[in-house]
């Protein structure tokens, strides 16, 4: 991890945490075409959409903070990851669970289910992918349940947490 970041600190559990800030212009020295390509997911027809832009913003922030190396989109559409760290070859998939889809607070289809998200996480890890968990749309209760499940399965070394407070490995 790079030294010299004024926003690097040790969390209450001893984990390394980097405060994230919205960086809309950081492109990591990429051309316009390369920057655009980061938002084009082959699994979604290589169209630039909201989800692709969100994923691009997340990986560029993690790259900028030194948590991952320079990334490209994984060109494999079927069973591919979202991104490949070109410095290590590690593939990364982003998961963005939501506690209450569409702002509803009642239990409904698509609502957070720790067992379901763990199945998805373990599937990615079994493929050799590490996982970036975007937990900005989880309640603190659901986030804690997910943290405990990850810890119980001993998957911490395969996860980067991305939330409102920062990113941490």
Predicted segments, located by residue:
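Catalytic toxin/effector domains delivered as secreted proteins or via bacterial secretion systems
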Residues: 2-169
């Amino acid at each position: 991890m790079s030294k010299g970041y004024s926003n690097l600190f040790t969390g209450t559990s001893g984990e390394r945490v980097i405060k994230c800030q919205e960086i809309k212009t950081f492109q990591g020295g990429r051309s316009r075409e390369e920057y655009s390509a980061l938002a084009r997911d082959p699994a979604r027809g290589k169209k630039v959409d909201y989800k692709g832009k969100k994923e691009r913003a997340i990986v560029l922030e993690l790259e900028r903070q030194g948590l991952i190396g320079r990334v490209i989109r994984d060109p494999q559409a079927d069973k591919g990851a979202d991104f490949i760290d070109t410095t290590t070859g590690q593939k990364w998939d982003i998961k963005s669970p939501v506690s209450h889809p569409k702002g509803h607070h009642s239990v409904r289809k698509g609502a957070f289910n720790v067992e379901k998200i763990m199945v998805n996480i373990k599937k990615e890890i079994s493929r050799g992918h590490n996982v970036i968990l975007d937990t900005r749309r989880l309640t603190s209760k659901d986030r804690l349940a997910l943290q405990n499940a990850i810890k119980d399965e001993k998957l911490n070394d395969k996860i980067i947490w991305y939330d409102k407070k920062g990113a941490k490995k």
